[in-house]
Amino acid sequence: MTRKTTFARLALACSLSALALGAQAQDKAVELKFANWLPGSHPLAKLGFEPWAKSVETASNGSIKVVLFPAQQLGKAADHYDMARDGIADMAWVSPGYQAGRFPVFAAAELPFQISKPGPGSAAVDKWYRSYAATEMKDVRLCFAHVHIGTLHSKKPITEPSQIKGMKIRPANGTVAQTMTLLGATNVQVSAPESRDALEKGVADAITFPWNSLLSFSIDKAVKNHTDMRLYAAAFTWVMNPSWYGKLSATQKKVIDDHCNNEWAGKVGAAWGDDEDSGQGKLEKAGHNIVKLTPQQLDAWKKAVEPISTQWVEAVGKNGVNGQQVLGALRQELKTRGAGQ
């Protein structure tokens, strides 16, 4: 089944679900301002935001009009959670890792060498986090969570974790920043849209990023070496303003609920994740150096970053969270779906 067919069937199912509520008076038209910080040409826009928006509009018989605001039009990348909370946007695509320490439980999804497959991994993270979102993200209403998987892209080939010492690295999120600090690097905190400039000006030597997005942001112009490993997962949430949701009719709420579920988490995660992985072949074809690791080298990486999970358990424990239990639940969900490492 093609990805296009999969999304079409999911959209049809959502539409039929809305129709099944029975004939009702036409709902009052509402606009959903959906903010994200990716360029409009980004794969997630084409494979996630746009299909989702179209499906919502179809299922609501046009009563919910989704207006996409890409490329930080409504605010900076790190501000998108607060934008949804404050009503600047009705819905926002959020990278919780851009605000290190603010969402400590969610950060467990971003621990290194933990997730191997973005589709089932997204479904696993989404199902797991729904038990904690009402407390940790209480200012907003969670739609769903999903992940992509990334690696290290650098100006020089990197095969051993010991080579990280002394480097200046742009981390994907707060958890990756901790990992790089552990390995002896200095973190360069810039958002994705600012990363190419930081690398070209020598402010950073390397970046942790997914494969195809490297091309979307033109970062491939600045780094030519790419270490082939599933180093980390970056986890994201789609969140909405509770007041906006509260003003919807019962029919419209049902439409949104049908689009804010575990199935959509897995579909969006798979569509984007598969596209990201395709970037490796594109870079190799363009003459970039894909750095392959031996099993021994990969084991050395995994051993070197083991303390990060221990640190996470200890950190959340100070806030009364049973870190071992939370992490165990996540890893069991990943294992059940065949998405662990």
Regions found by a protein language model. Give the residues of each.
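N-terminal secretory/targeting leader peptides
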Residues: 12, 26-120, 135-341
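N-terminal signal peptide c-region/cleavage motif recognized by signal peptidases
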Residues: 15, 20-22
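Bacterial N-terminal signal peptides that target proteins for export
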Residues: 1-11
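Signature of the catalytic double-stranded beta-helix
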Residues: 123-130
